[in-house]
Amino acid sequence: MSTGTNTRIDGPLVYLESPGPEHLPAIWKVYLDAPDYFEALTGSADFDPTAAEMMYEEALAEDNRYYLAIRRTDTKSLVGTIEFEAGADEVPATLRGLVVAQGERGKGYGRAALELAENFLANELGVRTIAADVPGGYDDGARFLEALGYRERRLKSAEFRWVKRIAES
């Protein structure tokens, strides 16, 4: 089972918490309200709740993987999800996914969630560098990461990833 199954990270604008199966309808609603992200991720514009549930189950099944709901602190409403992994690949941590419902974008929730995750990785797990996966063709995701200090780099595997140093040595 994932190490992120009982995680809660508090912040002033949003907090991150491990969702349970009862949260799946709210997560589906986020994906329905973010068709651009869902299409880039799955290759299909048609929302499939089974695909969203499989992504959720897969994230919870892996060690060192955190799949967290993004909730507004003022209303406690679920506005997105963030998924990251520690201790894998060529880098100490990888952002696997971050989605905020379109109706909630531009309000700082995605930025706040990513900053909470980066601080958690640096302060709790000692991670100094994080890479990020961006689905092909998801230009909004690439622009978002670039605005937050991520840079596209070639890894030893010759693969290109978005990378950011989140703590000093």
Regions inferred by a protein language model and the residue ranges of each:
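Conserved beta-strand-loop-alpha-helix junction that forms the acyl-donor binding cleft
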Residues: 105, 131-142
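A short helix-loop-beta-strand connector motif used in the catalytic cores of GNAT acetyltransferases and
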Residues: 56-69, 80
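A short, well-structured alpha-helix characteristic of acyl/acetyltransferase catalytic modules
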Residues: 1-57, 168-169
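Conserved acetyl-CoA binding element of GNAT-fold acetyltransferases
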Residues: 91-102
